[in-house]
From Swiss-Prot:
The lineage of its organism: Eukaryota, Fungi, Dikarya, Ascomycota, Pezizomycotina. It comes from Arthrinium sp. This is Polyprenyl transferase atnF. Its cofactor is Mg(2+). Glycans are attached at N9. Coiled coil: none annotated.
Length: 312
């Protein structure tokens, strides 16, 4: 509940900004689809493996549930960590100054306690649902998620660290099912490449809306570094992600449904996103980011439908 404080002139109680429950909810990004979009990367990889290996329904179902719980919790906890690290920057950027930490909705001490408890909870849930091997595979993801916010102060391409973090999310699903599978060939590598290029591309689009404020605040970003060549960089990343997805679909022996409603739709989205991005409009990047986040969920759904039809 929001605490009440006294006005300095003693004229009566007013509401403070402090609201722990609402603040943690927002720090966890539970008011957005970002967590679901993160889980969809794991689901997408799982469904590609299931298509290639013709996995049993029970195995896919159990991995699906475990991936959702693990990736959702990991996303929540490290979004909170990102906001802890960025609290001073966020207060200087128009779009983020109302976030829970700079606005006083949650104190730094409270946020740190929730973060520590959340890390242990994420590890415990991963071990319980997916086992020791997958938990070990998640360790690099947790480490990179911890490092990523700090990179904004050190290197000009923190998006590369984020891309590596999210691309590694294609590996735990494979570890979860590999005991019941044969060789995956180039499928894990091609999925890794596709997700890496997509996430760097996606975060560049997102970061484009904050470039003026980030420059003033001293935040390092590939979007700032590229300057007028931003769309050229997006084009290269867009082509590479499509090439990697085509290779992944070929490796998985994808059916007509996945090729037409998955790969083709994804390929068409790339030029649309780049041409629609208006760097003069501060809200353009956010809109296109949201469309692409939904696209990731859509791609996972199409891949899942493809697997379901093959099973039945």
């Amino acid at each position: 509940m929001a605490r009440k404080v006294e006005k300095e002139n003693g004229s009566g109680p007013i509401k403070s900004n402090h609201d722990l429950v609402r603040g943690v909810w927002q720090l966890f990004r539970l008011h957005t689809i970002e967590g679901l979009s993160t889980a969809s990367i794991g689901w997408l990889a799982l469904f590609f493996y299931a298509t290639q290996q013709q996995l049993a329904f029970d195995l896919v179902r159990n991995a699906f549930i475990g991936i959702f719980a693990t990736y959702q919790m990991t996303h929540c906890v490290f979004c909170l960590w990102n906001d802890i690290c960025d609290r001073d920057f966020d207060g200087k950027v128009a779009r983020t100054r109302d976030r829970p930490l700079p606005s006083g909705m949650v104190t730094l001490t409270e946020a740190m306690w929730v973060f520590v408890l959340g890390v242990f909870a994420s590890m415990g849930v991963t071990y319980w649902l997916l086992g020791a091997d997958v938990t070990l595979t998640m360790v690099p993801i947790w480490v990179l998620s911890f490092i990523y916010p700090l990179c904004k102060r050190i290197i000009w391409a923190p998006q590369v660290v984020l891309g590596l973090t999210m691309a590694l999310c294609v590996l735990p699903p494979w570890v979860a099912v590999r005991k019941n599978s044969g060789s995956a060939g180039l499928l894990p590598a091609s999925l890794f490449g596709a997700i890496f290029c997509w996430l760097v591309y996606l975060d560049l689009i997102y970061a484009s809306q904050d470039r003026p404020d980030d420059q003033k605040a001293g935040v390092k970003s590939l979007a700032i570094f590229l300057g007028d060549y931003l769309k050229a960089g997006l084009t290269v990343l867009g082509v590479l992600q499509v090439v990697c997805f085509v290779l992944a679909a070929s490796e998985a022996s994808a059916g007509f449904l996945l090729w037409v409603f998955g790969i083709a739709v994804w390929s068409a989205s790339v030029p649309w996103s780049i041409m629609s991005l208006d760097t003069r409009d501060r809200k353009s990047g956010g809109r296109i980011f949201l469309v692409n986040a939904i696209l990731g969920i859509y791609m996972a759904a199409v891949s899942g439908l493809n697997v379901s039809l093959a099973m039945w």
